[in-house]
Swiss-Prot record:
GO MF, any single term: rRNA (cytosine-N4-)-methyltransferase activity
SS bond partners: none
Protein name listed in UniProt: Ribosomal RNA small subunit methyltransferase H
InterPro entries: RsmH, SAM-dep_MeTrfase_MraW_recog, SAM-dependent_MTases_sf
Gene3D superfamilies: Putative methyltransferase TM0872, insert domain, Vaccinia Virus protein VP39
GO BP field: rRNA base methylation
Catalytic activity, EC: 2.1.1.199
Transmembrane segments: none
Family stated for the protein in its record: Belongs to the methyltransferase superfamily. RsmH family.
Species of the source: Clostridium perfringens (strain 13 / Type A)
Gene, per the UniProt record: rsmH
PANTHER family: 12S RRNA N4-METHYLCYTIDINE METHYLTRANSFERASE, S-ADENOSYL-METHYLTRANSFERASE MRAW
HAMAP family cross-referenced by the UniProt entry: 16SrRNA_methyltr_H
SUPFAM superfamilies named among the record's database cross-references: Putative methyltransferase TM0872, insert domain, S-adenosyl-L-methionine-dependent methyltransferases
Reactions that this protein is recorded to catalyse: cytidine(1402) in 16S rRNA + S-adenosyl-L-methionine = N(4)-methylcytidine(1402) in 16S rRNA + S-adenosyl-L-homocysteine + H(+)
Length: 310
């Protein structure tokens, strides 16, 4: 299957990075290389782009798309290793870091990857298929309490308890092996009235399982903190999120970096001596325009937040 992915908030991201032609930039989530291709077009031969992806399909497709550019370095790794990878490459400072936290259109549309609740496939959902831990293990081995916790916490699903209970009851007869098997179990757990309203009944549960498989939320804050350490003065970090859990982590981490003072509000002056490391470029997140929403509905939930290193 061809690796296709429509980049979200493309122009907004490029503007946010304030690209210098001789700068060093990091694209933490390569995907279909839409953002990367626009970054590298703006670089001279003295500039450099470092591109991460834990999905080998993405790296292969992007390598073909950007084969004419010799100033691109490809890294098969999760972006949580950003500090160590840059250090190993001999890079002390970069001028911009971009993180797109969404699942690519290719991963959603490629049935065999198991991300979609619209197509039948083995329960997988691994961003990095070299990892052994998949959605199958979660669905078939987690206790009812563990399933309830992740579906409630990561999916923000109000019927989490019923869904967890139905999963455990169904797997007593036989293991749950495919996405559509799981979808039918979720549908059975949710009252008919609720199924008829709002998004697809399996959307939140699939989101929760995907987050758990790939440990998505655990690594966001660490990556931001490690990435900021590598930003040059005036360098920027731009992050696109797609649901409230991610956005909350990014928002709060950015806020702590921009205002780290721990002194009580009644203190007339700061005595903790904790200085801001960054400034917020956008106090409110940037969202997709009406025009973008028309040709790319998946951008509807996207939010872009930006900081600049002081």
């Amino acid at each position: 299957m061809e690796f296709k992915h429509v980049s979200v908030l493309l122009d907004e991201c490029i503007n946010a990075l304030n690209i210098k032609e001789d700068g060093i930039y990091v694209d933490c989530t390569l995907g279909g290389a839409g953002h990367s291709s626009e970054i590298v077009k703006r670089l001279s031969s003295d500039g450099r782009l470092i591109r991460f992806d834990q999905d080998k399909d993405a790296l292969k497709a992007a390598g073909e798309r950007l084969k004419d550019y010799k100033n691109v370095t490809y890294v098969h790794s999760n972006f949580y290793a950003i500090y160590d990878v840059l250090t190993d490459l001999g890079i002390d400072g970069v001028d911009g870091i971009l993180m797109d936290l969404g699942v690519s259109s290719y991963q959603l549309d490629n049935g065999e990857r198991g991300f979609s609740y619209m197509q039948d496939a083995p329960l997988d959902m691994r961003m990095n298929r070299e990892n052994e831990f998949s959605a199958y293990e979660i669905v078939n081995t987690y206790s009812e309490e563990e399933l309830y916790r992740i579906i409630k916490e990561y999916g923000e699903e109000k019927f989490a308890k019923r869904i967890a209970s139905f999963i455990v009851k169904n797997r007593e007869e036989k293991n749950i092996e495919t996405t559509l098997e799981l979808v039918e179990i979720i549908k059975a757990a949710i009252p008919a009235k609720a199924r008829r309203e709002g998004p697809h009944p399996a959307k939140r549960t699939f989101q929760a399982i995907r987050i758990e498989v790939n440990k998505e939320l655990e690594i966001i804050s660490k990556t931001i903190l490690d990435g900021v350490k590598k930003l040059n003065k005036g360098g920027r970090m731009a992050i696109i999120t797609f649901h409230s859990l991610e956005d909350r982590i990014v928002k709060n981490t950015f806020k702590e970096l921009a205002n780290p003072c721990t002194c009580p509000s009644e203190f007339p002056v700061c005595v903790c001596n904790r200085k801001p490391e960054v400034k917020l470029i956008s106090r409110k997140p940037i969202e997709a325009s009406k025009e973008e929403l028309e040709f790319n509905p998946r951008s509807r939930s996207a939010k872009l937040r930006i900081i600049e290193k002081l």
